[in-house]
């Protein structure tokens, strides 16, 4: 859960360092490798929009939807028919941190969020991947494909549709 939250907060503000980027959508593959070299891969799609909205649609290995709008986080887990509602606090400082990410070279930026050192890789001037070592010392890589930037995304995309028969947990 903590990894999912960190990933969501990271990418809700992913494009903050790119001054002219207002929306971002892409397919992603997230690879998490632990110290024993065990690897778990997740895949799905992301849509994100300034100032602080994101929707992650995980399709494999399990279905999960994560919505962030301002300070509200909603996680919908169809396999267990559960919804988690959580306040994530103000992420503006994080947004500013990415906006001020340090350029390493033409295709690499370094950023810091709390205790995470994040590397943002660009390819053809688009966000290609993000890598970081999480709080459990897992190597995390989020690889993006089919990236679209500055396309119109309706704000309705970021409103979770909570099934009436799901259990709702407020944290």
Walk through the language-model features, giving the residues of each.
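Extracytoplasmic
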Residues: 21-23, 41-43, 51, 61, ...
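Boundary at the C-terminal end of the N-terminal hydrophobic targeting segment
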Residues: 16-18
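Flexible, surface-exposed loop/linker segments and immediately adjacent secondary-structure boundaries
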Residues: 78-115
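An acidic-aromatic
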Residues: 45-93
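Sec-dependent N-terminal signal peptides
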Residues: 4-13
């Amino acid at each position: 859960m903590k990894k999912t939250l960190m990933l969501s907060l990271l990418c809700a503000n992913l494009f903050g360092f790119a001054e002219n980027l207002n929306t971002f959508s892409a397919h992603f593959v997230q690879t998490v490798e632990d110290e024993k070299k065990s690897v778990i891969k997740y895949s799905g799609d992301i849509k994100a929009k300034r100032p602080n909205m994101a929707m992650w649609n995980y399709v494999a290995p399990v279905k999960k939807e994560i919505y962030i709008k301002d300070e509200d986080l909603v996680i919908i887990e169809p396999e267990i028919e559960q919804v988690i509602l959580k306040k994530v606090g103000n992420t503006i400082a994080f947004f500013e941190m990415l906006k001020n990410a340090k350029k390493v070279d033409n295709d690499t930026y370094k950023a810091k969020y709390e205790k995470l050192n994040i590397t943002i890789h660009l390819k053809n001037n688009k966000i290609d991947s993000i890598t970081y070592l999480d709080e459990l010392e897992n190597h995390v890589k989020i690889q993006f494909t089919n990236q679209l930037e500055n396309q119109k995304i309706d704000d309705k995309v970021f409103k979770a549709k909570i099934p009436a028969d799901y259990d709702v947990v407020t944290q």
